[in-house]
Amino acid sequence: SFLERREHSFRKLTKALNEHDMGTSLSLRKGAEVYYFPGIGDAKQIRELTIEGTDILLLEMPFAQWTDEIYVDVKKLIEKQKLTILLAHVERYDSFQKSRKIWNQIFKLPLYAQINTGGIDKHKKKRFIKKFLKLQVPLVLGSDCHNMKTRLPNLKQGRDSLRDIFGETLLATIDKTEERLLK
């Protein structure tokens, strides 16, 4: 199962970090980026996919126009399942939302949004972030790092770009949001 594979990978990672004397300096938690599926709001075992030690579900939304059904499911995750929803890489969904009705409804729910730091200095992403900030949804940052060859960690560069473009205040707000989420 996914949970068994994740546990195996986590043990391998922990062992490698300890072999390089890096294990004590990092605080690692198991988690999953969970792709939305119809009925997720009623899924009984969804809590097993939250970030370890929290009620946070990192939810990847459909790359399509969002519908009433999607809204109802997200609302159920929050209200019925009592989960804290963190929508993964929100900048990727924008272009699919020809109608903003459900987009706006979802972002009025008590949830958090994650933006990936790659390409923050590009015009299109800057424009998206400026527009998204008006929704006043609490933000956190992600690196979208999947490996050390083609999808490298880029949080430092992204943070520097955010600071240069939007100022220190936004970065401080994001840092406080991240601390509050993971405490």
Region locations from a protein language model:
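Divalent-metal (often Zn2+) His-rich catalytic cores of metallo-beta-lactamase-fold enzymes
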Residues: 1-7, 132-133, 138
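Extended substrate/RNA-proximal surfaces in nucleic-acid metabolism proteins
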Residues: 2-114
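Active-site-adjacent betaalpha module
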Residues: 90, 100, 118, 152, ...
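A C-terminal functional module that forms or caps the active site or interfaces directly
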Residues: 101, 112-114, 120, 124-128
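Short secondary-structure boundary segments
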Residues: 115-118, 143-145
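Short active-site-adjacent structural elements
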Residues: 121-125, 148-153, 182
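Short acidic/histidine-rich active-site segments
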Residues: 137-153
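Mid-to-C-terminal alpha-helical segments outside catalytic/metal-binding sites
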Residues: 155-183
